[in-house]
Amino acid sequence: MERWEDAAKLRLEMKARGVEKVPASSWVELDGKVHEFHVGDKSHPLSDKIYEKLDELGMEMKIMGYKPTTEVVMFDIEDEEKEHTLVHHSEKIAIAFSLVTTEPGESIRVTKNLRVCSDCHTAIRLISRITNREIIVRDNNRFHCFRDGYCSCNDYW
């Protein structure tokens, strides 16, 4: 519980000093156009299809034994709500968009402005296996190349 209190204090101090947290965003390019997504973003015209694909992937991942890493959510909320938050991370939305707008077998390339969290890293490994796709994610730390359930970083990032 101390971590939540420390995090809350830090956020208050940041706010008092005028320091703003950079919102997470991920983007992909399709047909020469950049599509940018934020956490929980439903502004895209294909949002219904994107979230349908996220739900479908979530069910398939759970069958494979996936359990969301709720510890990475820095809010003092119920685990069920934390799971809901994790599903809507920007890189997952960008990947789902790519899955519904590209041909099977095509590589997916996503750029993210922040570091990929451990839950998303695990989920993307599974998504690469489920979809038989190469998924390349460039976060602010490194390139991750996911293929058949494995990442080029060997889960060290």
Question: What is the meaning of each model-derived region?
Answer:
Residues 1-157:
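Terminal (and in a subset, N-terminal) low-complexity or junction segments at the ends
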